[in-house]
Each structure stands twice: as C-alpha cells, then as structure tokens.
C-alpha cells in the first residue's frame, strides 16, 4: 500500500510539471518592450516605451471612459490632445493652470496644427506687413508724416496689436477645421474662420461669415482705437510738459470719433482685405512650392498693409478724426491776429 501511494504522488507531480505555465514578462528587466494597439474607430495607435518599472499611466490622456481626448477638442481621434497639453477640448482649456496664458498657448498650438504656415504668416505680418503699413500711413500724410510722428507711432502700436488679432481670429484651428457649427446664432452654418474656407458652403453662408467677422473686427477696432487715441494724446501732453514751447502741428484726435474711425476701418476695409488674402493664400499653398509660396506671402502681406495704411489715413481725413487743414487754418488766423 505504501508503494502504491508513493507511485500515485509521483504521477501527480509529473502531471503538474507537464502543464505549460504562461510566460511572465518582467517589465523592469525588459525596458524596451513595446505595447501597441491597432488603429480603429475609437482608439488611435499607441506605442509606449516602458522606460521605468513604476509607470503610473501607460496611456496618459487616453480616450477611454467616453471622453473624446482629441486634438484640440475635435471628434474622431487622438489621445491627450496630441501634445497640446491635457486631453483636448474645452475641459482642458477651462482647467488650464496658467489661466489666460495657458488658453492662448493652447489656441496657438491648435492653429499651428491646422496650418503649419501660421507662425511664418504671423512673423511676416508683424515685420514686413507692419513696416509696409507704417510706410503707407506716412506716405499719405503731409511731409511724409514727419510732422505727425505722434500719430504714426500710435498707428504702429495699434497696428501691431490689430494685425495679430486679425490673423489669430481668422486662422482655423485643429478643433474647428472643417466645422461649420461654431459661430453663434444665425451664423451657425457659416464658415468659422474666413469666407473662403474649404467646405460645401453656400454664397449666403460665406457672406454671413463676412458680416460676422466684420462685426467682430469692428469691436476690436473700437477698443484698439481707444487705446491708440489715449497713447497719441498722452504723447502730445507729455511733450508739452517737457517742452512748453512745443505746439502740436495737428489738432489732437477726438477720442470717440477716432475710435469709431478705427472701428469702421477694421469692420469694412481690414475685414474685406484679410478675408480675400486668406483665400488667395489658401489657393497658392496648393499650387506653389514652399519657397515660392513664402515669397508670395511676403509680397501679398506687404501690399495689403500698404493699402491698409493708406486707406486708414484717407478714412481719418474723411471723418475728421485726424484733420490737418483745420489746425493749419487756426494757426494762420492766430498769426494774422
């Protein structure tokens, strides 16, 4: 009996040893192990290098649990915002620890993702375009603007802000690229960026974008006009305090009237020019080599800003917000007396 019991124990041990156990991968000893998931409708391809055995989140910011987790808030793909900080969408913007600065950085990255040429366009707009704008402004003033340098400096400051705001607002984002449901109210079916945006939009939809952007730009121009007028008048007062014998060659622009002039200029002239410019650049980017395209951007931005600077001076003369003749006539009468 003892011999039979010993044989049964030996056979049981041999049966257990014959069972194949699953292979256990020790991630701490094999740091180069790669885990990949195939691309499908809800999960993007993921390649993870386990460089640390204490990896807390192997799929940071993933789209599980019903969250979209996409690039800048658009639906369809991407995990963790595609490098835009956070999991994308409005939730990440609202929870940004940097406040307005964080929101601006996220918006900038989203625009770069939608248009890789966006930083170059902004750079050309601020350097070449703004220089051309100042030249156009000075060329439209008497004595090439040398007697109105306070106005020219005000145009320089306000123009640099407005140029950036215009490009930032018109540029498509990764979240709204191809979306027509981002504008409010009756403009909800209109293109979200500019009237020549790619998509199946009607003529009225595109015209609606022109109207909506015009109202937005007019509001921005009104605020910038207030700032610019305050800067210009402040410089005049400062120079008078430093040099009591100084006489202003021109009548200081009225704050409200000059602000309304800026609003009209932005809502009508600047809006129409920038809408058209974005459409032209969109077409040129498809047919021209990168170097030729960048050269064309420089030329277009330069010509656009020269026209913008000249049109603003003409409009300011028409509205009387920056009048030279009235001040000259007053000075002549004072000399006669």
UniProtKB/Swiss-Prot annotation:
Disruption phenotype: Defects in embryo development, seedling germination and early growth. Pale interveinal phenotype due to marked reduction in the density of mesophyll cells in interveinal regions of leaves. Residues 70-96 are annotated as: Disordered. Residues 70-89 have a biased composition (Gly residues). Its main location: plastid. The keyword Ribonucleoprotein does not apply. The chain crosses the membrane at residues 151-171, 216-236. Belongs to the RETICULATA family. This is Protein RETICULATA-RELATED 3, chloroplastic. It comes from Arabidopsis thaliana.
């Amino acid at each position: 009996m003892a011999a039979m019991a010993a044989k049964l124990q030996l056979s049981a041990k041999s049966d257990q040893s014959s069972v194949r156990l699953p292979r256990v991968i020790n991630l701490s000893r094999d740091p180069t192990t790669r885990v990949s998931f195939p691309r499908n409708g809800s999960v993007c391809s993921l390649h993870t290098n386990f460089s640390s055995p204490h990896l807390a989140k192997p799929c940071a910011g993933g789209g599980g649990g019903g969250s979209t987790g996409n690039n800048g808030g658009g639906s369809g793909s991407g995990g963790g915002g595609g490098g835009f900080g956070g999991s994308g969408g409005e939730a990440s913007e609202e929870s940004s620890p940097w406040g307005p600065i964080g929101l601006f950085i996220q918006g900038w990255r989203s625009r770069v993702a939608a248009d890789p040429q966006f930083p170059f366009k902004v750079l050309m707009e601020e350097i070449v375009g703004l220089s051309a704008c100042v030249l156009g402004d000075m060329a439209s003033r008497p004595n090439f603007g040398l007697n109105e340098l306070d106005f020219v400096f005000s145009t320089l400051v306000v123009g640099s802000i407005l140029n950036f705001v215009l490009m930032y607002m018109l540029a498509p984002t990764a979240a709204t690229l191809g979306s027509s449901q981002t504008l409010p109210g009756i403009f909800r079916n209109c293109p979200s960026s500019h009237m020549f945006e790619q998509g199946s939009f009607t003529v009225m939809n595109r015209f609606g974008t022109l109207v909506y952007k015009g109202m937005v730009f007019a509001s921005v121009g009104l605020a910038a006009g207030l700032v610019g007028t305050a800067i210009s008048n402040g410089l005049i007062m400062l120079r008078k305090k430093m040099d009591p014998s100084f006489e202003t060659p021109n009548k200081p622009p009225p704050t409200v009237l000059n602000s309304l002039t800026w609003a009209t200029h932005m809502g009508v002239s600047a809006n129409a020019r920038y809408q058209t410019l974005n459409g032209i650049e969109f077409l040129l980017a498809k047919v021209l080599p990168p170097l030729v395209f960048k050269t064309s951007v420089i030329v277009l931005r330069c010509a656009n800003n020269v026209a913008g600077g000249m049109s603003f001076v003409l409009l300011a003369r028409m509205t009387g917000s920056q009048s030279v003749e009235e001040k000259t006539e007053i000075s002549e009468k004072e000399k006669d007396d």
